[in-house]
């Protein structure tokens, strides 16, 4: 179910403050965050945000095509290694 249009998109306050501070200074530096639920808004375009995936922070460069998506969509938490090639024990 999608978020109601009456509500604004969720962006963590600490993340929003960091981005606004960098926009006023016109600086570009990596912003580290644990907030995977924050929605990407147009003021984030051009910044690099390091998103936590449970183990490390993955740097993601924000482009205009990412607006409206959540930050967590761009930092996968599980690495699928593929199915077992020859698993005869589980067949028994």
From Swiss-Prot:
Organism of this sequence: Carica papaya (Papaya)
Annotated InterPro entries: Ribosomal_uS19, Ribosomal_uS19_bac-type, Ribosomal_uS19_CS, Ribosomal_uS19_SF
One cellular-component annotation, GO: chloroplast
Record key words, sorted: Chloroplast, Plastid, Ribonucleoprotein, Ribosomal protein, RNA-binding, rRNA-binding
Designated name of the protein: Small ribosomal subunit protein uS19c
An example Gene Ontology biological process: translation
Pfam families in UniProt: Ribosomal_S19
S-S pairs: none
Subcellular localization, as worded in the UniProt entry: Plastid, Chloroplast
Gene name linked to the record: rps19
């Amino acid at each position: 179910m999608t978020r109601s249009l009456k509500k604004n998109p969720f962006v963590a306050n600490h993340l929003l403050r960091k981005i606004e501070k960098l926009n006023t200074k016109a600086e570009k530096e990596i912003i580290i965050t644990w907030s995977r639920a924050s929605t990407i808004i147009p003021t984030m375009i051009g910044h690099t945000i390091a998103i936590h995936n449970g183990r490390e922070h993955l740097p993601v460069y924000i482009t205009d095509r990412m607006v409206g998506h959540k930050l967590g969509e761009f930092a996968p938490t599980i690495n699928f290694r593929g199915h077992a090639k020859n698993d005869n024990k589980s067949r028994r």
